[in-house]
Structures are given as structure tokens and as C-alpha cells.
Curated annotation (Swiss-Prot):
Pfam families: Ank_2 (PF12796). This is Putative ankyrin repeat protein RBE_0220. PROSITE patterns: ANK_REP_REGION (PS50297), ANK_REPEAT (PS50088). Gene3D superfamilies: Ankyrin repeat-containing domain. ANK repeats lie at residues 308-337, 342-371, 375-404, 445-474, 478-507, 512-541, 545-574, 578-607. It comes from Rickettsia bellii (strain RML369-C). Keywords: ANK repeat, Repeat. SMART domains: ANK.
Amino acid sequence: MSKAVISEKAEPRELKALYIVGPEIEPDPEILKLYDRKDCLVVGDGIDDADIYAIYLELKKHNVQIGPNTRIDIAAHGKRVDKKHYLRLSTEEVTETKKFLQQLQGSSPIDPIYVHLWSCYGGTANKDIAFLNPGSIIVTHVKSQYSSFGPADNFAHLHSITRYINEKNLTPHLQYLYDQLENYQATTFNQKESDGRIVKFKTTRTPEHDSMANIISNILEQKQSEELLKEFQNYLNKEAENFSKLFGEYLASEDKEKFQHYTSNISDKDLKNYVTGLLLNIANLSNKNNIKDKEKILTILNKIVNILGTSLLAVTVRNNNVELTKALLNKGADQHAKYTKIDMSLLYIACLNKSVDIAKLLLEYNVDPNYPTTDNDTPLLQACEKKSPELVKALLAKNADPNKVSDRGLSPLIVSCINPSEESREIALNLLANKNIKVNILGPNDFTPLILACYNNSERVVQALLDKEADVNAKDKDGFTPLFAAYRNHSTKITELLLEKGANPDVINPKTKSSILYNACNEGDLNIIKLLLKHKANPNLTTFDGTTPLMAACEKGDLEIAALLLKNGADINKSNNNGDNALFLACKNGNLELVKMLVENGVDLKKGSRGMIASSIAKKNGYEKVGAFLKAEIKSQRTLNTNQSNNPLPPKPPRLIKNTTTQNEENKKTWIKSEANLTLSQPHYNFLQSNSEAKSRALREINPLIEAAIKEVDKVNTVNVAVREEVQNILSKELLRIPINNLVDNKKGIINQITKELKLNNSQDNNNREYKISQQSLKEIGNKIFAAYGHKIQPQLTNTTTHRWQNYIKTTNNTNANKSNYLGKR
């Protein structure tokens, strides 16, 4: 997946509607059509899980967030245990509804959330409203003692959501009033038989839901009476009154007129004035960055505390009113006050708002920098989530704990490594500068900071983590290591950093059972391949179906990668579970040069797959030249075998081993047999080696000679990678004509002459000192080296070998013309 460095995304957009669908739930296609908009999102599809982590990933993927105006509909199987409601959001377990809703509001813990719950026994969740932010709404659609009826729920959901999505400027608080009648009308269709009677499922918003359902039912059955209609009006008035108490503070000023319209029938005029006048007035005053009305605000402070459960200081902090906050603190306001029932500190609210000035002001008054919310979120965690390096520095300077983990499984370092923005990278570096930081702390799904930093291609953060000795081989919940994360971005630099710190290059993808080397070969990432092989990656590890990296390279037709793998010990004749080997796969794409290279390195030409050999599959796929080449090679091998069978040879000479003794006077290596005194002056000579084997061994001698020469040239001029590879490829082919024993005995002279010729033929640009050379020049160099060292030298035979040769002549009546059969063809 090469990828560009991930840039910082724009600020997340607020969703208008979020639809959470649990397992085994079939959402109505008409409902899904309504959600098919940029400002709406569906998580889960009745098959996949829709738990809080799945929601988090989807929100991050689409760069959206839950806000105070987001309507959240949850359709999931539910159950009631010990008077608590549970949702089935994943295939493996159930989640307590209260905790799930608290996690949903975690992205902005001071804002209300608006939830419709479509679940069996949903009425049990009504009391969970007490644990949510002030102003939150939970609308349940089934009584606590009844199971749900899917089609009717879909009908009610469709009616309810249509207005909310299609109507502009409709806040949750106004939608709440619209829902009173609309949802009750819809739920009259929600019927099923139970114990021989018809059970009507009802919306369980208020204690009056039973009487309300009867009212709606009678109206629909045309059994209206004056008393019934009055009862209906009273119900709506009471709902409006409840609405005023709960949500008056949260109405924006532009909603005031609409709000007054919907509350016009409230009988308690004083209550109406209090809600629509006093609270809105206080909110407006606290929003203005001045202190003209300070005394008036302080006078009514107790009333605000009694009704909202909070203090005016909390309101001014929330509204980022620096001047009024200073005035209240100087007046003696309690800097340790908390915000409502969720027990948020004022410092936490300041961090939520990225209010650096207010946060510093509170820290000067010695507020606790580590005071957590009920979910164990700390101010430092929020500062990291809001991507504010300045806030983080201020908190760390006051000894904020960098290792505190919230109930969401998040720590400051995890959060800063999750986010790819430059601000978050700066925060991560600030945290890593803290001597108490835990670099291997775990986040959701057992992600470590290093894994996350590698996923986000954060090179500086990765380096800082490695300097702090972060675990380079740590695995997440699914078994992936930092090296996998780095490879996902094809990040050569981060991959190199990890390997140099001891990352295991042979880790296996737990899902595909493939190595990173295999993946790199399959995707043609040459730089990563070179790094992995440099750090001793195993080139013969297979995937679940037995495929090796070499097979992947050959199937892609990549000659350069295949040659590199063979040079590093790849098994050329290994087959996968289908019987295919590297040659067979190379023949499928018709790369003649690749096929020739495999043959030169000793691939088995007769090894087949599914009843066919490589030459046959090449012809079948229309690659006549490849097929003809392989057929000629097979014929050549048969001729060699026939000659050998007509001229039976003596037993193959015993294996030679290297003597560690050095003759100082000649500085030559002596080779001896472990059981007899057979000595040869050409240690690598093999009497019976085939043509392809000879070439393979010769390449192993040639390549180091060329590399040594290039290094000498490199001291004077810069030889770039492309030129280096061209020199290697062309000269290797030219020097293959030289007998292997000549190569072995004349290494130093050959290196010196190659170096000299390369320097002479260089067409260097003096301005940039870059080495350049033409293909023709390389071929001419090869001819010169061959002229100097390519003459044929017969092996010098010892007495024992000569004796065997004489016996061979006597028994076969062969002439010297057959001597090459005995010695082996070059």
C-alpha cells in the first residue's frame, strides 16, 4: 500500500445522524437511503459488529464526530438483567447500555447527546438518563417488560428520522417536541399477540406513557371527548414543562422564539419566564467577554447552582470568558468546583475547549492537574485529544500524570500517536521527553505507541520511542508488530530504524500467514526487500499455500528481485501446494530473461505441475520463444546424460574440505581430502558439474569481484544504484566465459583491471561528479578481461587422479578427445 506521508486532516465535521445497527438486525432499506448522505453515518450492517471500537474507527475513517445536534439511533437486540438494560452490539458479548451511552458522549463530555433506542425491554434504559450530560435525551420505543417487533420499529424509526434529516435548522430539543405525537402514532402499529391479548408497544419517555398511549389509541379510533382532548393538551403542556426544566439552558438564542412558541401553553407563567428569560440571560451574559454585569450575575449565582447543579464559574470557564473567570476567582469562587453530575473539573473543561489562558489561570490557583472524570479522563488526555501542544506543556510543567489510562483504554501517549497531525507528533515528543513516561503502555486492541506511530508514518516519534527502548517486536491484539505497520506505508526509513533496533524480519501476518518479505516481493518494493535481506530475512518462508517470495517475484516477472532472492539463498526448486515452482510461474508471464536466469541458476527443468512441465505451460500461454528455449535446454541436458552413460565414469571424487593451514611462503590455500591425500590446485573445480551449476557457482565468484571494483570507483566518483546494477548485470554475463579456476586464482588481478577499465571508460559529468558508463563500454571491458584471463586451463592432476585417468583410458579405449567428458564441460 509507495505511500505519501499522511498529512494532517481537517477538523472533524459534526454528524447530523448516526445509525448503529447490531448483529442479526435487518435495517429497512428505506431508512438506509435516508442515511446515504455525507453528514450521516451507519455503523454495523446486521452482520459486522457495531461496538464502541467499531464506531470509533468509522468516525475516524470519515473524519466526523458526534456533537450535541447529532441524532443517534441504536437498533440492537437487548435484554434486562437485575433491572439494568444490556445491548448486543457484537457477536460475542453484550454491553451495559448505560456504559455504552457514556462512551458515546466521551468525545465531548460537556455536551448533551440525543439517542433513540430501538431494542427489546428498552424502557429499562430510561433511568440511564441520570448518568448522561445535562440536556441529554433518551427516547425508548418499547416498554421495559416487552420484547420488540422489528417491522413496527422500522416504521416508527422511518417516520421519526425523515423529519429530522430533511428539515433544516432542527435542533434535538425541538425535534423532541415533534416526536411526541409522531412516534406515538407510529407505535400504534407496533402490535403482537402475547398471552391471548394484543400488546401495544409504546414510547417510554415519561411516567405518563401508559395513559398517553390510551389517549392516542382512542383518538385514532375516533372516540374523542372533550375530557379526552383536555387530557391530551395537559399531557403536552406537562411535556413542554419537563422540556423547559431539562433543556432551557442549552437553547441557542436563535431558538428562543421557537421555544416560546412550543411552551406557550405552560400554565406556570413564572416557570416559563424563569426558563426562557433568566437562564438565557445568564448564558448570554457569561458568553460576553466583559464583567459589566458581574454583580448581577453573582447575585443570582445561588439560583443557578440550585437548578443546574453547577456554578457560574463553570459556565464562564466553559464559555472561555477569561475576564469573568479572573473576576470570579478573585472574588473567592471555588476553583475546585465541579461541573454537574459527571464530576468534571474546571481544568478539564478548559482543556476540552482548548482554552490555554484559562487552563494556565486555573493552574496558577493550584487546581489538581490529575483530577479525573467519572470515566477516568484527565485534563492531559483531553489536551492530547484536542491537539494542543501548549496545553500539554503547561500541564506537564505542573506534574500531570502522562501514564493515566481512561476507561476508554486511552493514555496521553496513545492518543498522540493515534493522530497523524503535526500537533500530535509534537505532543508525543513532549510526552517522551518526560522521564516518567511508559513507552510500552497499551491502548485499545493492545496497540502500543510504537505500532501507532508506525501506522501514521511518524518518523520522528518512532525514533524517539526507539531511543526510549520501545519494544520493536510487541504485538497488538491481532498479532501485528510495528514492522507490519511500517510496511503498510512502505516506509523505508522507519523499516530500517526498526530492523536496526532488532525487529524480527520474519514475523508472519497472522491473517494471511505471509512474511513481510513475501508481501514486498508480491508488491515489488525493492528497497524494503533489500533492507529485509540485509537483516537476514528468511527468503524461503511460505504463505498458507506454500508460496515463497521467489515464486511471487517470478509470477510478477520481476527479474531483479528474483536475482536478489537467489543471491541470498532462495530455494529455486521449492514448489507450492499446487505443485508450481518459480520456473513454472515465470513461464506463465513469458519473461524470457527471467527464465534464462533461473536456468543458469540450476532450476529443475523437468519438475512439473498438474501434469505439465514449464516448457509446456509457456507454449500453452503463447510464449513460443520461452518454450523453445526450455525445450533446447532439456535436449542439451539429455545429450550430456547420454554421453556420460556411454562413457561410464569412475566414482565421483570425494568431497574436498578446506585446510586451515596457510603456506606463508606462497600465501596459497591448500585443500585436502579428509580420508586420502588427493590434492587439487583448483579448489572449486567439480568434475561432474552441469552447465547451469557451473554458471551458478561462477556467478558467486564473479559478483564479489565486480562489487570490489565498484567500491574502488566509488571512492572517486558517486556510482548511483541504477549504474551500479547495470555494471553488475552486464559484466557478470561477460565474465561468465572465464573458467571458474581462472577466476579463483586471479582475483586480485581481475579486480584491479576491472577498476582500471571502469575509471578509464567513465563519462563523468565534472559538475556533479556522478559516474556514468555505456552498455557498449561495459561489454568492451568484459572482452578485455576475458582476453587477459579467459584462456582454458586444464586441471592439474595429482598422481592419484592421473592413475584413475590412465585406468579409464585402458578400460574404455577412449582417446584424449574424450578427456573433457571425464573432467566435465564448462
